[in-house]
Amino acid sequence: MSTKLRYLHHPASQPCRAVHQFMLENNIEFQEEIVDITTDINEQPEFRERYNPTGQVPILVDGDFTIWESAAIVYYLSEKYDCSSSWWGSTLEERGHIQQYMHWYAYTLRLGGGAFHWTIFAPMIYGYDKDFTVEVTKGRFLLYESFDILEKYWLKDGDYLCGNTLSYPDLATCQDLVSHDAGRIIPTSMWDSHPKVKAWFARMMDREHAKTVSAWQYENVRKYLDDGVKLNFQRKTAVLKGTEVYSGHNNGIIYNGDDDSFVTQHG
């Protein structure tokens, strides 16, 4: 007898939303289990030992097998359920192109998630008396720089990031931008100066399952921005990985005021 998949996640997490959308898009049955990352439950030794030594979500449990890291989970599900080859490419060249995107994305656009995290969640976690200017600046730089590459390279010849067919990079990237859009991190001028990215994001958000998995993020982040309703963070450690600022990394990049541009300070 087969056991239903257990999916441990939280809708505040971009990787969690991307995996969730993939499962919905492919009609994969699963048992949903929300891990309350506003607490420190996923940092407890028992949780780390049983599910993930990093304490991060998403996590997929398939019988006696447990797997974490969003792209790894989606690849596993693609193989297990013989999903369309379009998700990871049907030819050697397509697969290489998609892997190229995922590697680029991991150290650029994904790290740009710091723009959202340090603007919206970090003050709730660490206190509003803390100054996160450096962290926000790094995140915005990576985010805005990524917009240029999305526009000029990844969306240059197709409706989707890796061609004219929907693939997993579209889901991962869309859910990253959901956080920035919900948090009003991306100015109107940035969307307007990147029409291909703007049209692609609108096309992605027209998908039923994209709306479903992102509803929590929009609702709760906008409640905070518009009405001052904060999430009750009891933890005092980072919620999302990939947002830490390391000494010397992108050192010298500074935000240049309200025109949403960046300059590099030398010397």
UniProtKB/Swiss-Prot annotation:
EC number: 4.5.1.3
Molecular function in Gene Ontology: dichloromethane dehalogenase activity; glutathione transferase activity
Top EC category: lyase
Domain GST N-terminal: residue ranges: 3-85
Predominant localisation class: cytoplasm
Coiled-coil zones: none
UniProtKB keywords: Cytoplasm, Lyase
PANTHER family: GH16740P-RELATED, PTHR43917
Homology family: Belongs to the GST superfamily.
UniProt name for this protein: Dichloromethane dehalogenase
The organism of origin for this protein: Methylophilus leisingeri (strain DSM 6813 / VKM B-2013 / DM11)
